Structures are given as C-alpha cells and as structure tokens.
Amino acid sequence: MDASRDIGSFVVWDYVVFAGMLLISAAIGIYYAFAGGGQQTSKDFLMGGRSMSAVPVALSLTASFMSAVTVLGTPAEVYRFGAIFSIFVITYFFVVVISAEVFLPVFYRLGITSTYEYLELRFNRCIRLCGTILFIVQTILYTGIVIYAPALALNQVTGFDLWGAVVATGVVCTFYCTLGGLKAVVWTDVFQVGIMVAGFASVIIQASITQHGINKILSDAFNGGRLNFWNFDPNPLQRHTFWTIVIGGTFTWTTIYGVNQSQVQRYISCKSRLHAKLSLYVNLVGLWVILTCSIFCGLALYSRYRECDPWTSKKVSAIDQLMPYLVLDILKNYPGVPGLFVACAYSGTLSTVSSSINALAAVTVEDLIKPRFKSLSEKSLSWISQGMSVLYGALCIGMAALASLMGALLQAALSIFGMVGGPLLGLFSLGILVPFANSIGALTGLLAGFAISLWVGIGAQLYPPLPERTLPLPLETYGCNITHNGSDWMSTTEMPFSTSAFQIHNAERTPLMDNWYSLSYLYFSTIGTLTTLFVGILISLSTGGRKQNLDPRFLLTKQDFLSNFDVFKKRNHVLNYKLHPVEVGGTDNPAFNHVELNFTDHSGKINGTRL
C-alpha cells in the first residue's frame, strides 16, 4: 500500500455536521430548562427529580463511559496490540453485576445525592470530606484532559481548529448542564450515543467496502496476528492477558461504575430501584455494542495499513491519530461524513464532560455547602447548583488550556487518576461489606491503599516496563513509497501523551523495576482496593470494631439479593408493617420509610409512591 495515498481534508459540510451536533445538544438543554416547570429545587437540577426511566439513563451511562479517548484510543490499541482487548466484554459483565447487586442497593436505599454522603453516614465527616475533595481535584484534572486530548489528535490530522473545538466543547457542555441539569445531561447523552454509533457505522461500512468485505478484514487481521483473543498467561507483569483484563479490569472499572459520583448519580436518579438496576443491565448491552464497533475499527485499521503503517512512516505523529487518518482516507469522497466521525468523537467528549460538571456541582452542594448553610431554601440551592456548573465548566476549559502546557506530565496525571480509584473502591467496599469496619480502620486503610498504589504507579512512570512485557505486535512499512510525496503537512509536534521526558533514561534495571514497577497497569486499582480492605479490616479488629452498633441500612444484606425475586411474587397481598407506623398527612421519602413493603396492592402504588 502506497503511503503517498492522497487523503482528504475537512470541507464546509464537515463543519456543518459538527456544528449541528453542538446546536442540538444546546437545544436539549434549553428545552429542559423550561419543561415541567424548570429546575425548581436542587433535587430537580441534580437528580432529575428522581423520576428518570431505565432506558435513557442506560444510554447516558454508556455515552459518558465511552469518552473520545475510547473512540480514538481503542481502535489504535487493537491496531497496535491486537483484539485481546475484546475480553473486556467479560469484564463489563462483572462490573455491571457488582455495581447493580452490591453498591446500588445501599446507595438507593439511603436516598443520597452525593456518593460521599455514605462515607459520613457509615464512618465520619472527615472521611466524607477526604472523598469529596479527592473527587473534585481528580475530575477537574481528568475532564480538562478529556477535552484537550482528542482535540489535539483531530487537529493534527484533519486540521480541525484546536482551540475552537476546545472552547466550543466546554461552552456547550456548560450551557446545557447549567440550564437543564441532570435531565438535559441524560437526554443529550441519548442523542450523542446515537451519533457515536452512526460515526462508527460509517467507518465500518466504508472500510468493509474499501477492503472488499468483512471476511477480508478478518483474514488480514488473522494473518497479522491481531486475532489474539486468548492469552491465559498468569504473569501479572504482562500488560494484557485474559487474567489482567478480567481481574484487573473488573477492579479498575468498578471504581467508575460502582462508586464514582458521575455514574452513581445517574442510576440512583431513577424512579425506582427496579429502573435503576435495569439501567445498568441495559447499559451493558450498549457497552458491548460500542466495544464491538471500536474493536472492528481497529481490525479495519490494520487491514488498510498492514503494508505501510502511517505511524512508523511518520504520516501521523501519534498512535491516537490513526482513526482520524483512516476516516479522511476512506471517506474523503463523502462530504460531511468525516464531520460525522468528528461529531462521534466529540459526542464522547461532551457526554463525559457534562456528566463530570453535573457530578461536581452535586458533590459541592451536598458535601460542602448544605452542611454549612442549612437554612438555604431549595430554590437557593438550585441557583447555587447552576452557578457551580458554570464555575466548573470554566475550570475544565482552563484545565484543558493547562493540559496543553503540561507535556509529559499528562500521562502521569491520567495514571494517577486511575490509581486513586482503587483505594476509594476499597473504602466503600469496607463500609458496605464489612460490618465491623470502623472509622479508624477506614482512614488507615485508605491511606495505606493510596500509598502503595501511588508507589507502584509513579514507579511505572519513571521506569516503564520493557517492550517484551507490553507485547506490541509488528508493524510493516515495506509497502510505503519512500518519497512521501505530498506528506509534509503531516509533520506535526508529538502528542503530549508520550512520557519520554518524565522517564529516567539509562538507569540500570533493578529487580524492583523489572517486577514491581512492571506490573500491568490494570492491577494498580486492584492493589489499592485490596490493600485498603486488608489494612482496614486489620485495624478495625484491633480497635474495637466489633463493639459498634451499626445501622443495617449501611450494609449489603441478604434481603437486598432476595428482593430481586419479589417481582415473581403475586402483587395482591396485604402490606406487613413494622412497629413504626407512617404518620398521617406526611409524604414519606421511600428511601427512609419505616414501612416494610413486601407486597403492593393492585395499583402498584403505596402512598403515591410507585414501586
């Protein structure tokens, strides 16, 4: 394949498609600013009035999980390392089941808005503040990178204006988050996940035509060693094996679906626990669809460039730029379609950023403002929540600008963001699964988990694993035209995700570097979680944890699992009451109701509350 292939460039119709995606997203925000009386209370703004249905929430969960980093990065991952990444279909299943059956029942029962409220209810306010502040710092940092990274990759390949895209993304997200609250975020995500699927579909269809069929793409991938689905090597130092993806990946992504405010806030906004669980399980199908699309795009990349790798031949300066390069290569004769793919990538960015802004506003209001200013009315809290959305939107845009100056530190920042999730998962698991865990054990376990996960993570940045541990597959350039005719425009600065400036070169390799620091990155969260649990349990036992009298609402109980089967019981039985009757004339919060609702009447409602 000739590397001098004439690829296309962005035209007016591509910009029109991209602008249309932004305008529709903004219009959804305007609609939900006024629909149903607008955002009258903080609960309306932050939780959608706790009236959301399963399907839109499921699509929102999928959209916000699959950022532009996924749209651009996963196909490049498959191109470089093979389709073993597809084992994540198993990982996603475990993640969703754990989130739905372990964490959701407790969070939904308590009726909380901020995930970190649980930490105060279960332990103390100090631990709650630790979790809140850590989440705020991490999320601002990560969101800025999510805005900047895909903008840079697309700019260097397509010529798409870098800062125009960064500012437009940040402003539009802030606009519809501020006006429409969680409902706008969810329904915009529904629209954006459709754009993501359409963008992937356009690439898959045209790649299949260009490469003469799906069978040809799969045949090329097989001959090139890309269909490496099964690697059962138990060595934890290998970057991706079946075990690192299933075990390490489950811990890594449960930190997001199980305890991260951005995701938890969505499913506990559902109108019933059944809808909340359904949203997670329907979302699983969405995750599988998006992953399948991105895996196939990676195989199409290899089929197209198996004889002349654009990265090795300097046609692109970073592996993340391969998907935009492919789009301009195979879709150059279809004006507007390359713009659809850019809209696909930015839909991932918009969904992630909007979810982050809404979650940041929620934890700030619930964890930092309401406890200190208890006299504030719901209307005032709603206005404050909107103000927080504006503030955090501006901070995320500012972080994107700062990201452009950080260079090699970006990868370290992203890695640290992933590492701190493990100890937090361990902290929540300690509270929900260990009845005798106390605040001393929780805080000590959290600190120990952070220390060990940061140690291995930062060490891996300073002394990265050797190539034989990462198992990159060979890339060929024998089919390239060495004259590189017309390719000067592709000479760009290197993507800042290379950590070369942050690494210590020419250092003598020690056993610590070749073993501890070479651990698969997917095990960082695993180590943090298990360390937090182990130390937390040990310290709790030695500091009188068994003597505490704990409210069972804060724990996962057998009834939480058995209640899944209540749907099969007849619904015409009489209610069984506990000793505490409902007061006449009051409207009870179902999360704190003293009535044990074993069965419902024929209407399916109790005191106006739909089950």
Swiss-Prot record:
One of its GO terms (cellular component) is apical plasma membrane. InterPro entries: Na/Glc_symporter_sf (IPR038377), Na/solute_symporter (IPR001734), SLC5sbd_SMCT1 (IPR041992), Sodium:Solute_Symporter_SSF (IPR051163). It is found in: Apical cell membrane. Expressed in brain, colon, kidney and in the ileum and jejunum of small intestine. In the kidney, expression occurred in the proximal tubule and the loop of Henle, being restricted to tubular epithelial cells in both the cortex and the medulla. In the colon, predominantly expressed in the distal half of the large bowel and in the most terminal ileum. Localized selectively in the luminal surface of crypts in the large intestine and to the brush border in the middle parts of crypts in the cecum. Residues 31-51, 108-132, 183-184, 261-279, 360-389, 437-439, 540-611 are cytoplasmic. Keywords: Apoptosis, Cell membrane, Glycoprotein, Ion transport, Membrane, Sodium, Sodium transport, Symport, Transmembrane, Transmembrane helix, Transport, Tumor suppressor. GO terms for biological process: acetate transport; apoptotic process; chloride transport; iodide transport; monocarboxylic acid transport; nicotinate transport; nitrate transmembrane transport; propanoate transmembrane transport. It comes from the Eukaryota. Glycans are attached at N485. A motif (PDZ-binding) lies at residues 609-611. Residues 1-9, 73-86, 154-161, 206-239, 301-336, 411-415, 461-518 are extracellular. PROSITE patterns: NA_SOLUT_SYMP_3. It is a multi-pass membrane protein. The chain crosses the membrane at residues 10-30, 52-72, 87-107, 133-153, 162-182, 185-205, 240-260, 280-300, 337-359, 390-410, 416-436, 440-460, 519-539. Interacts (via PDZ-binding motif) with PDZK1 (via PDZ domains 1 and 3); interaction increases nicotinate transport activity of SLC5A8. This is Sodium-coupled monocarboxylate transporter 1. It comes from Mus musculus.
